[in-house]
């Protein structure tokens, strides 16, 4: 947001210099990102003075040049060669002396005046045309001044050229109230008043507003009060299109707006003055003399000011005549209804549009205008009538118009102040410093915050509705601190905090640990969109369609919901690569998943229905180990992925023997299991079902793991590295074949083994699984290998046999297992 220092001083009476103003604005939260000195005429015409042509003779060696003597107020006339056809004795002109730098046409290209000889005659300056000075476009001849112009007067003084300072304020999205010169002046005045200065904001006087006649009545009808809570309008007739005055053009250029004509410039001027967007319609183009605020039928074509035809939706608020749409409300005008060179009668629109409606429409059409920027953040709902009066009076003054109607103001449900309580104790607690109560009251008064009641150190306050960023106690305390001054809160010399903290798992460190391990083992990280297709979730039980978080204004049907699982993103990546003959894949992805649960929603806390989880997905497909001269190719399998999962969990310090592993019945997988620790599910792993693969056109088997990374972080234990002396005594290996029911898992047997022989059992592994006709129905065979070791002595056969008998007995008692002969 560009703020002109000269323009700002129209509304606040202060002797502060531009640099001091910029410093204060930064201190109170309106960060100044740029500061630049500017001139209404580039270069300020330094070295250009008023001159009087004393003599004008023909050049001895040219039929179109003149040799002149010019009085520039120094007492010694200058000889200057001039080729202008209107050069003559007695003329008052603007003369550029030697050394002057001009910027012809107001551009960036310099032109320096030098002592020179023109066809043998010395010339000590230049008599200037308008375009050479950068103050106009005419080059028909030298610029003629009135006869009363005094020779020697600097062009800067004669033309009243002023220096200005451009202050570029980086507005945060919540401070739309400061998106105008009045808004910035209001903040500056609050700062000065809180420090005892008698300063107030001088609002432009609109008391002279009164209709000159009632010849141009326009009826206004609002059909959608939700989208347009307030709509005001007034007409001005018999306007004359002309350039706006120099002072207004200078203001607009400082704000970054190119002047166009007086009517358009007035609406832009009021926008940057008051922060209220206006729209001026050519009243002659309003059919039926009626303005209707409504939506149009889906697909209605509409041509905007840029000449582009756009298809409207039923959710786009439009400003219409009795017959057709004329303007996209709060966003962009129409090509056939705006101000043109033939306009004489004007309808001025001044409205408050619902920010949500404007934001959705602006995003839908990809339009970002000065008006939509303000409307979608929330303009002052009490400024509309004032702004309409201001614009109408300016059109009367600068375009010779006649105010031809009363102001029509449709405002059925006035927007009230934001009301809440704030306590002095809470102010001190949040700021970290005691601020005297009188200082707080002074700041609140300076911010135009009304104190409705005070009791037991608690203030009941009313905040003006133009401060859309201050709607609760914490917001107001931030505003108090902003005006009080961040730099006035001292940094304490001592930190009141314990120096010992309970160690907490670092999610980022664990992410890096997982990523390093997976990447080192041939996996490739992918990154996919959090938005996905709603069709993926239709008919699923694992992730129901009604639990999707839906986007209100999706970019396309393919990106209409937030993902509940990373599975579909992973399958899209597999399908994309497989179609390009890259079917051997090992992939992983970190990402958030999003959920909606209507049962958790309440009027007091509607956001409780929404939740998200951070997850890690891993997938393998195709060949896991490629062939080489000494290795046969190995296809990816469920066990390939399970091995990766267990190694990853070990790296996180999780005892995999403490995991509870259960079979998972899911419509996502043809076979799967879950791993949980202390009742908290950590991951699901399985073979993706054919039905799911068919949805995405994936033909090959995909083995997939999805880990709840947040649960994993909470389950992680810090590694304690303990050095142990290597055992001097040998290990003993024993194998055992067990006949068990099909539902018995190796994990269950392993848990029983370690619970039975904690002292001697070093490890247990599964090296064979057999199911076939030679076994009873419902049975399978596990071949287990046990490593036994005693750190204090060499195991004898008696101790080994006793340990194996204990294991066999517990397997039979707890798992129904029998030793195979």
Residue ranges and their predicted role:
Residues 2, 442-452, 469, 473, ...:
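A carboxyl-terminal module marker
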Residues 188, 192-222, 399-427, 433-434, ...:
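Terminal amphipathic helices with adjacent charged low-complexity linkers/tails
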Residues 1-212, 347, 366, 370, ...:
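Phosphate-backbone binding interfaces of nucleic-acid-interacting proteins
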Residues 420-585, 734, 787-791, 799-821:
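Extended, well-folded interaction surfaces typified by the phenylalanyl-tRNA synthetase beta subunit core
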Residues 119-134, 138-144, 155-165, 169, ...:
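Mobile "lid/hinge" segments at catalytic clefts and subdomain interfaces of large enzymes
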Residues 49-80, 152, 249-250, 267-336:
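Conserved mixed alpha/beta core segments that line enzyme active sites in large multi-domain catalysts
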Residues 116, 292-332, 336-339, 495-612, ...:
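Class II aminoacyl-tRNA synthetase-like tRNA-binding/catalytic domains
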Residues 5, 23, 27-28, 40, ...:
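Glycine/proline-enriched, intrinsically flexible loops and inter-domain linkers
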């Amino acid at each position: 947001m560009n703020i002109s220092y000269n323009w700002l001083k129209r509304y606040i009476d202060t002797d502060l210099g531009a640099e001091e103003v910029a410093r204060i604005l930064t201190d109170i939260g309106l960060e100044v990102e740029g500061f630049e000195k500017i001139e209404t005429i580039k270069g300020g015409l330094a070295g250009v003075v008023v001159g009087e042509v004393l003599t004008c003779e023909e050049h001895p060696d040219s039929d179109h040049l003149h040799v002149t003597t010019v009085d520039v107020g120094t007492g010694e006339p200058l000889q200057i060669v001039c080729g202008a056809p209107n050069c003559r004795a007695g003329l008052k002109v603007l003369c550029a002396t030697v050394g002057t730098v001009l910027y012809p046409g107001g551009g960036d290209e310099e032109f320096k005046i030098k002592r020179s000889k023109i066809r043998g005659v010395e010339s000590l300056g230049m008599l200037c045309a308008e375009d050479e000075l950068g103050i106009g476009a005419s080059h028909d001849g030298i610029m003629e001044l009135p006869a009363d112009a005094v020779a020697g007067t600097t062009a800067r003084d004669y033309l009243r050229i002023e220096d200005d300072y451009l202050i570029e304020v980086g507005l945060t999205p919540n401070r739309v109230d400061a998106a105008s010169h009045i808004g910035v002046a209001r903040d500056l005045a609050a700062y000065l008043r809180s420090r005892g200065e008698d300063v107030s904001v001088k609002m432009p006087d609109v008391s002279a507003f009164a209709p000159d006649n009632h010849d141009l009545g326009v009826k206004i009808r609002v059909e959608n009060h939700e989208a347009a809570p307030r709509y005001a309008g007034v007409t001005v007739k018999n306007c004359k299109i002309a350039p706006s005055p120099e002072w207004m053009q200078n203001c607009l250029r400082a704000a970054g707006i190119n002047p166009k004509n007086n009517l358009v410039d007035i609406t832009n001027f009021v926008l940057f003055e008051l922060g209220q967007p206006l729209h001026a319609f050519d009243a002659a183009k309003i059919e039926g003399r009626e303005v209707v605020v409504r939506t149009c039928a889906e697909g209605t074509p509409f041509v905007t000011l840029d000449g582009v035809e756009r298809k409207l939706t039923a959710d786009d608020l439009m400003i219409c005549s009795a017959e057709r749409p004329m303007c996209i409300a709060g966003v962009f005008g129409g090509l056939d209804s705006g101000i043109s060179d033939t306009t004489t009668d004007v309808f001025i629109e001044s409205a408050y549009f619902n920010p949500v409606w404007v934001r959705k429409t602006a995003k839908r059409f990809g339009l970002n205008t000065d008006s939509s920027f303000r409307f979608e953040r929330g303009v002052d709902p009490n400024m509309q009538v004032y702004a309409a009066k201001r614009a109408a009076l300016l059109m009367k003054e600068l375009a010779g118009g006649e105010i031809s109607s009363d102001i029509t103001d449709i405002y059925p449900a006035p927007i009230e102040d934001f009301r809440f309580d704030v306590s002095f104790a809470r102010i001190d607690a949040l700021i970290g410093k005691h601020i005297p109560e009188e200082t707080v009251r002074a700041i609140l008064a300076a911010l135009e915050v009304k104190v409705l009641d005070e009791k037991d150190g608690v203030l009941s306050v009313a905040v003006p509705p133009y401060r859309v960023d201050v709607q609760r106690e914490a917001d107001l305390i931030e505003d108090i601190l902003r005006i009080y001054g961040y730099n006035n809160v001292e940094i304490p010399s001592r930190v009141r905090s314990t120096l010992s903290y309970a160690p907490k798992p670092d999610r980022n460190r664990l992410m890096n640990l997982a990523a390093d391990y997976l990447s080192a083992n041939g996996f490739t990280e992918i990154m996919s969109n959090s938005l996905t297709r709603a069709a993926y979730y239709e008919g699923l039980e694992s992730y129901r369609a009604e639990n999707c978080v839906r986007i209100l204004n999706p970019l396309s049907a393919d990106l209409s919901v937030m993902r509940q699982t990373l599975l579909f993103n992973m399958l899209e990546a597999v399908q994309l690569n497989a179609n390009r003959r890259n079917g051997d894949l090992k992939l992983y992805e970190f990402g958030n998943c999003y959920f909606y649960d209507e049962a958790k929603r309440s009027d007091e806390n509607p956001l409780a229905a929404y939740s998200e989880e951070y997850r890690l997905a891993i997938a393998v497909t195709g060949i896991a180990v490629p062939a080489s001269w000494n290795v046969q190719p190995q296809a990816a399998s469920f066990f390939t992925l399970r091995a990766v999962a267990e190694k990853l969990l070990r790296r996180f310090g999780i005892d995999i023997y403490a995991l509870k592993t259960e079979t998972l019945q899911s419509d996502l997988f043809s076979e799967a299991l879950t791993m949980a620790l202390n009742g908290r599910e950590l991951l699901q792993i399985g073979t993706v079902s054919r039905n799911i693969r068919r949805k995405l056109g994936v033909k090959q088997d995909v083995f997939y793991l999805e880990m709840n990374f947040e649960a994993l972080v909470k389950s992680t234990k810090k590694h304690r590295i303990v050095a142990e002396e290597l055992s001097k005594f040998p290990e003993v290996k024993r194998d055992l074949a067990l006949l068990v029911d099909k539902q018995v898992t190796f994990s269950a047997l392993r848990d029983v083994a370690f619970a039975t022989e904690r002292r001697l059992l070093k490890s247990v592994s599964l090296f064979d699984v057999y199911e076939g006709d030679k076994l009873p129905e419902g049975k399978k065979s596990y071949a287990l290998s046990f490593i036994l070791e005693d750190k204090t002595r060499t195991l004898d056969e008696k101790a080994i046999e006793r340990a194996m008998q204990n294991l066999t007995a517990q397997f039979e008692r707890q798992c129904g297992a029998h030793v195979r002969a």
